[in-house]
UniProtKB/Swiss-Prot annotation:
Name this protein carries in UniProt: UDP-N-acetylglucosamine 1-carboxyvinyltransferase
GO cellular component: cytoplasm
UniProt-annotated binding residues for phosphoenolpyruvate: K22, N23
Catalyzed reactions per annotation: phosphoenolpyruvate + UDP-N-acetyl-alpha-D-glucosamine = UDP-N-acetyl-3-O-(1-carboxyvinyl)-alpha-D-glucosamine + phosphate
Record-linked SUPFAM superfamilies: EPT/RTPC-like
Function: Cell wall formation. Adds enolpyruvyl to UDP-N-acetylglucosamine.
Molecular function (Gene Ontology), one example: UDP-N-acetylglucosamine 1-carboxyvinyltransferase activity
Enzyme Commission numbers on file: 2.5.1.7
Organism: Chelativorans sp. (strain BNC1)
Biochemical pathway: Cell wall biogenesis; peptidoglycan biosynthesis
Amino-acid positions noted as binding UDP-N-acetyl-alpha-D-glucosamine in the UniProt annotation, renumbered to this chain: R102, R131, P132, V133, D134, L135, K171, V172, S173, V174, D316, I338
Amino acid sequence: MDRIRIRGGSELNGTIPISGAKNAALPLMIASLLTDDTLTLENVPHLADVEQLIRILGNHGVDYSVNGRRENQDKGYSRTVHFTARSIVDTTAPYELVSKMRASFWVIGPLLARMGEAKVSLPGGCAIGTRPVDLFIEGLRSLGAAIDIEGGYVIARAKDGLVGTRFRFPKVSVGATHVLMMAASLARGQTVLENAAREPEIVNLADCLNAMGAKISGAGTPTITIEGVTSLSGARHRIIPDRIETGTYALAVAMAGGDVMLEGARADLLETALDVIQQTGAEITRADTGIRIRRNGNGISPVDITTEPFPGFPTDLQAQFMAVMTKAKGNSRITETIFENRFMHVQELARLGARISLSGQEAVVEGVDRLKGAPVMATDLRASVSLLIAGLAAEGETTVNRVYHLDRGFERLEEKLSSCGADIERISG
């Protein structure tokens, strides 16, 4: 199993290209199920989750090619991929595929809208009564679907098609907003989604669906209106730059020091996070070509944050921000409001010398002068990269195990950091 070794103490200087956003790519790829024409997506990141979704879509009959060739590229940055679902050969998404990636459950919306039926496994770990998929089920029922749960599968039917509705999300959900927006695109009549997620990835999907012939307005606001159409066509669409990758590398510079240009990054996608990073003492310059971040040797200022839906501070940057706060000059308070159990990185950061106390969904980080390298274990995608950020500023050698988590969401991370002076390498086996 691969691991990554970091020797801390080096500043970061240079240019890092920002890849296409994973959280935008996945729903856009799933949208290919809505049409029998070809959907061409530009700036698709080369990630384990993307490759897994390609396999899942293939199970339903979606063919794909990379720059005109059917292949699974092992190397290369974000690329252009063509997806074609001439016919849906299977409306079942089996457990062995869905269990590997929660976002694959989202195929339920397009399959139901196009074929009138879908049988999709519940994602692994869903407890009855607290399932994250409850919002999806409520929304699809509101569109007229008959839904049963049998043997660990959600079985959805809409024999006469979906019908427009007015649906208010009980709580903001990015995934459920994606799914209902796709499903409602082919429903009869008008659908109004209230308390919808406002994330840039929602806007990116709406723009793509509109290019395919959908009639969607209000994406990026709490109220999205969809006028159903009878069919969608193919389109060519570009995936937005990854705001979480942007924030991650900005935080890496805030931690290690240096001067880095994040090429292709868009500041408007993460203004709140950039403001917070600036408060830690980093200097941020917004440009047409990207974002430049600099930090000299003046130390890191403590900042309190609370994670919130967009446009608030993103939960997907919480772990990385906590890593930076471990070396701040004072105490900081981090409150997680989006997900439960999202402090799994705390124990591993403590192995490096961090001082963090937990109380429910709140963490208090007491900044220390020195972190010391140690072997650590990645527990999930965002936690794993927080350990790398801490390792950049730790004395000696830090080894991060289980880095397959990183490969799910960061394209060639160690190569990008190494090009800016980090002493980092992947060790195979």
